[in-house]
Design a protein with these regions (language model features):
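Aromatic/His-enriched, Gly/Pro-containing loop or helix-boundary segments
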Residues: 1-11
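Active-site cores that bind ATP or allylic diphosphates and position pyrophosphate for catalysis
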Residues: 14-169
Length: 169
């Protein structure tokens, strides 16, 4: 991902220009940046005029780029196993797409890479269902086709542990 920093930056800036993301200059801990969990307080940077935000970027002020989740309403996505799933947008956080060091978050890189590689089906564990609405909103913001999601139950090594490549399963 570090070798493709320019690619991810280009797409993140495109979302800012289209109003689907914003520059955030707030000082949050790295864990808060990565998780998007910071008390769900409204981000004061969310509604900064683009010209003001761009001037701060141009002046060298550190920033992240956050996804601008629509306020109110719902987002529905389809899963091949679970069917249609609808979530309230108010339950979704404005996740970080591009970190202060210019590297993308895993979730943002996934969407960009899957699109650029022509991925049509995304198969993953059901524990990742909660990420799908944000992915959908990103695909829609770019005007890209949304892949077919297939969220499966985890395959278990034993009664307590999922199979894992890390453990040689």
């Amino acid at each position: 991902q570090s070798q493709r920093r320019d690619t991810y930056g280009k797409y993140a800036r495109l979302l800012v220009e289209r109003g689907h993301a914003y520059y955030c200059f707030c000082e949050k801990t790295e864990s808060e940046e990565d998780s998007g969990e910071f008390g769900r307080a409204p981000d004061p940077c969310r509604d900064l005029p683009l010209e003001e935000a761009q001037a701060r970027v141009d002046a060298g002020e550190p920033f992240v780029i956050r996804q601008k989740i629509p306020r109110g309403g719902t987002t529905t996505f389809q899963d091949a196993i679970f069917g249609d799933i609808t979530v309230e947008n108010d339950t979704l956080d404005d996740q970080v797409l591009l970190k202060r060091d210019g590297l993308p978050t895993y979730n943002f890189a996934n969407v960009i890479d899957d699109h650029l590689m022509g991925i049509t089906h995304v198969v993953r564990g059901s524990e990742y269902l909660s990420s799908a609405p944000k992915y959908n909103l990103l695909y829609q913001a770019f005007g890209w086709d949304i892949p077919t999601y297939v969220h499966c139950s985890p395959v278990m090594r034993d009664a307590q542990n999922k199979m894992s490549k890390r453990h040689g399963d």
